[in-house]
């Protein structure tokens, strides 16, 4: 219901209320001290009271100042006989006319209920605003004209507006005496009583008639209708006091009172309910690696996996081991002695001979597979310093150097007054994250996580235990003697006999077959090149060899002609899902996407390290003409008189025209941190920012734990080939899991890498001897023989790739104290201090040099796709892709033309050994041969084959341990032992042997069948191949013809003693036996005749062991024993002795870039380099942290008026509102237009003109805002510095003004001298003089500087500011003034009598010159470092004349912290005739 206020007024009023709060809050203290009341015509008014001293004048009290304004009446042309009511100013139409002319009666609202007011007479309140006229009374006599009011200030002339249309007469005004107008404005006219709800509008007024003469007083008329409110008339004489009227209706609620002081804290409330789950926080920094966890409990046994798909057929296995020995056959008939057999087959190969001498160096092998990339090496040593560069061009003058070292500390000053406790500082920058705290207790059981990915295949289970040996069968009855059995296996090695006497050298044996191939020895030294041998004779053609291994695929043939299109084949079955491809490397960055919307500002990061200095930029363009230089030194004045007292302030000049708006004020101090706001709703997802540059490679992560094994899923469809993923980091090795149950046999795997060498297994029990198999076909090449003896140490190999850096070993014992080290490097910069106050902008610097290339930023989010770029150059050939699914069968192609025969392929390198094939089926039994013709009786044979094995003798005594047998085959690896403690890092090992060849590649598709080639020439004989594997047994051949007698075979091994045979015919003398051990010497008996053999005696006791016989021939190689059970893991061995120092290896490859070392000491400054080319524009950086709050902006333009709101409920009564200054309306008027004709009819409400007291309050408010924007340097409205005053009021003269550099409350403003020519702010000293007298009597003859304030009795340090302000006020304000200034200066006048102040004319030097002490305790001298030296503008104290003279000293600096001067130390004092005094000039800041 603010219908009577212009919408522009409302907007301004609302805006200014906010400003008023800021202005008034600080002035509350002043209002309490000085109530700001006003007195006019002897009447006292409170601050912000509004009254009318005359009917046509309205005044407001504005903090002690009375502001009055004339009331201007609108002409009422439609009212012929308008009347001015008593006490009003403006004429109104009589009510009878309005009622008749309007044609409608004015409705009157219901009368309100009388208020419940106690009859207590209070003090007289200030007059309320004009109430509505009472009902028509009898007309009183005209009162005398009141005294003329004081003339008001002249207002500005407004431009004449276009006349508006006449408005209708408004309804009756609001009810009378309420509170002051501010309460009405807040509450609105929402009362139920009175005429506030009259909705009927008056008709237009008639034309105004001539004023008639006053008629005679009529009889009192009847009670008239309530009239419109009249303008204030001239006051009549006061009538007698009428009877007390009935209580009026309650006034409208006033404005809300000011907030009371905060109440005491309430008791702590009960804890609130559990809040909703918060949004996830930002990810924390990676924690420190935790302790190694304890091994987890064994998991429950998993369910049996689904049956695997049927595996492909395995490769053919190796020939099976010979079967067990068959049962003993029935004894055959005794045959006749046969004829001598053919020469026996070649005996088995002897044991491998000792390792031969190293062969000549073979040709260089094919290059090995590339090794895995080594980890980056350690940083290389710093290179030698390069040669001195050429002299560069002369650099520009450098920036001023840093201040020199502090001078010797002065004598301690007297204790200062303790400063007031400072306000608590703003929060510092967030510290870096702390170290991880101690390990917390285990948390509660978390929710079950989602199913993890399928784990990797577990390690193979431990080999099963060997089955128990079956029970021994019963001994069968001895059968009749069978044919001589085959030679038994070599018996267990007997106890080691004593060495026998050396026998005679035997005849040389036949050359043994080549032994198995030994492991390659280490490379021998290269031998001299041998002479070329003669070409051998071509050998005979051998029989046709078996099929060779398939050759390597030949070179591709020429493309054949296109075949006929075949008919499409049926679609093949769905292929298995291929394995996921390895993660590919990151693709190249895509083209830049369109500019995304600006993202939300990020969280403020920790401060980054200081970047390297950038390169100097290009020289800037020529600058504008500089500002006029500093004021020159004054010319020699005459002698300055002593300073006179300050003159009285001159009369205030006329107020000048309003200056242009001043610049924004300096930035205020940061406010105290606000209380945390409520959490905002989560914002919408921001548009992804631009892609950042690729980040640096992160550190290698730890290996993750293997996940639980998932159950087998159903077979998926063939997926499309995935994009190459990024390579994942290796997780740490998981703890060994428990052995799983043996799984079903899987298909054969690829050939694995060789396992670690297992510990020697326990010897297995000796196997039974198998039947002798038939000789197999020639086998494939044998496996490598056992490793040969270690060769001589070869030359040092090339450096291997650097291994990964091992974990740090345990700390060694502390070393002995070393010699004192060189001075350390300069430490890193400390953390940045809290943000200072913003200084004034400096002058533009020269462009800097181009900066170093920055480090790559972290990888940004992928940008939106950019426009299609041009096609790139073809990339390098990518790796072969995974085989795609089998395509549908193509149509039959036409027959191609016969291709050219391909070139003969190169002989392929032999492929790796194939997996052993499965055992072949046993061959069928050969046919029984026909019985041979009975031969003639042969010559007596040699000693018969040994008979069958006799029964076992009694066990012999335990022999000495035999020599170590050859190592058994590697047993299966035992279970993982517990981790030992970490050993000391060993020395680097020797270079390992060449690695095993890689896995076989996939088979190529078979080539087309080539045509038969023509016979080639016979090739030279190839080298002897290694013996092949034993082939399957062939069928027995046909029975051959009896061969001719062969040469006698070699002696067979001595058989075990058989049962005694029946007496045979006398044989030929046997071969001489080996000499037996010498028996005890007996009498030589005669040889008796050979008796007939008696019956078989019982088995005699075992004779004593004979001397060890000569070694028998090498027996056939036994079958491979079964793998022994795995031995337990042995204890860790003792640490070996340190080996000899190895030869130095060749230099390793370059290591990783080391961490940046600490900065070295600054080198000598090099000559400036040439100016580099200007760099490209950098990409937009990421949003910086939120800066400190900027300076307060200018007030915004007045916004458009809003629609009228709903009427609010009546508020509680408020205190009297503040006054308002009417001059605000000067800013509202529009110069081009007159007033809006409908300006008082905004909400279809009738209204009179704008209430005058609103205008008055606005005018007062406008003055206060203007003072904030353009301070006038008074104590009530101080400026920040004199420079601000000069900018706001350039026409003002130099003089004393008030400033408040630290802003805030104005109580601590200080009075200074403002030099309006230069804008300098000069603070007076207090006191400003040291009286002239003899201050010091020297005790010794030595003269030294004596500090006046510190040493001289009665001396004092100089202080500044006036006595009226609180102590330290000037010091606090000067601290801020220094921050706001860039230059400072001060003059000191030294009055002397027989005392040197500056130059000593007698000696011509400055040794006796006075010292000055700056406010930061620095000493300012007459000579020395130019930044700490003062000048003498006038020097009259050069010699002792017996008269008073003076020297004027000036010190100027851009280090504002050095001024003002706080003490002076003369040297040439102490004599009885030596006197001095000082005038301390003001310190001036600019």
UniProtKB/Swiss-Prot annotation:
Query: Which parts of the sequence carry 3-hydroxyproline?
Result: 672, 1146, 1188, 1203, 1209, 1215
Instruction: Please list the residue ranges that the record marks as compositionally biased, kind Pro residues.
Output: 163-175, 210-219, 435-444, 913-922, 1201-1218
Q: Where are the annotated segments for Nonhelical region (C-terminal)?
A: 1217-1243
Provide the leader sequence positions: 1-26
Residues of the propeptide: 27-183, 1244-1486
Member of which family? Belongs to the fibrillar collagen family.
Protein name from the UniProt record = Collagen alpha-1(II) chain
Q: What is the lineage of its organism?
A: Eukaryota, Metazoa, Chordata, Craniata, Vertebrata
